[in-house]
Amino acid sequence: MHCPFCAAVDTKVIDSRLVGDGSQVRRRRQCLECHERFTTFEMAELVMPRVIKSDDIREPFDEEKLRRGMQKALEKRPVSSDDVEMAISYIKSQLRATGEREVPSKMIGNLVMDELKKLDKVAYIRFASVYRSFEDIREFGEEIARLQG
């Protein structure tokens, strides 16, 4: 790593420590030229797969879009924001775990439905009604019956 003080190429690591939950490493470095010390933080860059929409258009994964969709389904429901964030993290880890560069949007929708089903049944029905384009009350009833059965 280049020294931020003199731009020298050679620096050495003096100390390394895990930060927080262990997903980040704090390194204390010293420049071999000017001998100044500085701190860096290192973490793995995890690339999310691209999303293949139903019309075959590809777009980058949008975590905010995922969050908005879940929050809309969970509106005025007794679910903590921590639980929502944990569900989002789980969905993202499942998508990365596929090892694929691209995933169909349908897979994301199914993962969201699975997580909402665990968090809140009403939110699950709300999301499913839009995601599966329920046409009438009968389809709502069938989905509710599946939940209860």
Swiss-Prot record:
Q: Which InterPro entries match?
A: ATP-cone_dom (IPR005144), NrdR-like_N (IPR055173), RNR_NrdR-like (IPR003796)
Q: Which cofactor does it need?
A: Zn(2+)
Q: Name one Pfam family in it.
A: Zn_ribbon_NrdR
Instruction: Please give the biological process terms from Gene Ontology that the record holds.
Output: negative regulation of DNA-templated transcription
Record keyword DNA-binding present? yes
Zinc finger spans (unnamed)?
3-34
ATP-cone domain sequence ranges: 49-139
PROSITE patterns linked to this entry = ATP_CONE (PS51161)
Family in the record = Belongs to the NrdR family.
**Matches recorded under NCBIfam families:** transcriptional regulator NrdR (TIGR00244)
What this chain does, per the entry, is described as:
Negatively regulates transcription of bacterial ribonucleotide reductase nrd genes and operons by binding to NrdR-boxes.
PANTHER family per record: TRANSCRIPTIONAL REPRESSOR NRDR
The entry's protein name is Transcriptional repressor NrdR
- What organism is recorded for this protein? Photorhabdus laumondii subsp. laumondii (strain DSM 15139 / CIP 105565 / TT01) (Photorhabdus luminescens subsp. laumondii)
Supply the source organism's classification: Bacteria, Pseudomonadati, Pseudomonadota, Gammaproteobacteria, Enterobacterales
- Gene encoding this chain? nrdR
